[in-house]
Amino acid sequence: RQRQMCIRDSRTRDLGSEYAISDSAGYLDLVAEHRLVPGIHRVSYSVANRKPVSANLYTIPASAKVGIISDVDDTIMITQAPVPWKAAYNLLFLDPKKKASVPGMSVLFTRIADLFPGAPFFYLSTSPWNVESSIRNFITDHGFPEGPLLLRDLDPRPKTFVPTGPQHKLEFAEQLMADFPDMKFILVGDDGQKDPTTYATIARRYPGRVLAIVIRELSPRESTGLASVTGLTSTQPTPVTDVPVFTGTTGSNILKTMLPYLKTVLR
C-alpha cells in the first residue's frame, strides 16, 4: 500500500515528504536524499491519520573508511541461538533488563570505536523487527556503540521462526558493500551458527574489503545444548580465509590478540 511519509528532524526542520510502498505487514524501505551533518539525528515519521513516531537516523561521515558488521545473537547478547526454543524464549519473552551481555564484547567494540572515530556499527540479526526495541535497549544499556539494526520480517512458520540466517546475513552484507564502496569492514560473529562460513564467503566475494573476521567462541555450556538434542555439534570451525581471523570466548580475550593488528592498520 502506497503511503506519503513526512519526515522531520529533532530541530523541527521539515525534511520533506516521500512516497513509499509497504508490504502486507507494513514494512517498507525508503530511499531519500537530504543534507544532514554526520551523527545521530532524532527524526519523526508520520503518515495521514496516524500519530507520528520517532526513531534515530544514523548519518555516516564520508570520511569513515572502516565499518563494523556484527551479529547480535550469542555474539554480543547471550540468546543460545543454536537451541531454537531457548533462542525464541530469550528473544521474545525474557525481560530486556535480564538479557545477558557476552563478557567483554562492549569493551572490545568501544575500543574499536576509539581506534576508528566515526566508524559505523551495523548490527545484523535474524531476529524479527518485532523485537527491535528490545535489542536497541540492550545495546544502549550494555554500553555498545549505537548503530543501525538490520533485522528481518517475522515469519511464524516453525522452520523459519528462528533461522540460522546465512542468506539473510549475506544479503545485508552485500548491500552494505554496495552502499559503501570505499569502506572496509570488520565482520564480527560467533561459532554457534554459520557465521564462520558466511563471513569467509563474504571475504572471498569481496577481496580487499574485509579487514578482519572476529569469531566469538561459545562456552561449553552454550554449545552443548544442541548436541544433547540432535547428537551433532552446534559450533562451526574457524573459517579458512586469507583475512586475519581472531577468536576467543570473551571480548577481552579477542581484544588482546586483535589490538596489535588494528594498530598496524592505522599506520
Please give the residue ranges for each predicted region.
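Short, small-residue-biased leader/transition segments that mark boundaries at the very start
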Residues: Q2-I7
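Short amphipathic beta-strand segments in non-cytosolic proteins
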Residues: R8-S17
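Glycine-centered loop-to-beta-strand initiation motif
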Residues: G16-H34
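Short, aromatic- and glycine-rich surface loops/edge beta-strands on solvent-exposed regions
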Residues: V37-N49
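Edge beta-strands of extracellular beta-sandwich domains
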Residues: K51-I60
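Asp-based phosphoryl-transfer active-site loop
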Residues: G67-A81
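Short, acidic loop-to-helix structural element flanking the phosphoryl-transfer center
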Residues: F93-A119, W129-S133
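C-terminal cap/substrate-recognition subdomain and adjoining C-terminal extension
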Residues: S127-R267
